[in-house]
From Swiss-Prot:
GO biological process: ribosomal small subunit assembly; translation
Record function comment: Protein S19 forms a complex with S13 that binds strongly to the 16S ribosomal RNA.
A single MF term (Gene Ontology): rRNA binding
Gene that encodes the chain: rpsS
The UniProt record lists the keyword Ribosomal protein: yes
Protein name: Small ribosomal subunit protein uS19
Amino acid sequence: MSRSLKKGPFVDHHLLAKVEKAVAIKDKKPVKTWSRRSTILPEFIGVTIAVHNGKQHVPVYVTDQMVGHKLGEFALTRTFKGHPADKKAKR
């Protein structure tokens, strides 16, 4: 179920302040955040945000097609190592 339009998109205040500061001084360093739940706003376009995936910060360069999605969608938390090999096929 999507969020109500009258509420508007959710963005953590500390993340919004960091991004606005980075845009104002044209800083190219990634903005570090643990806020995977924040929605990407048009103000974030062109900024690199380092999103925490539980182990490390994954750099995410925000483009116009990402607006409206959550930051956590672009920093995967699970690594797929592949299915175990079939023991019958090895014989």
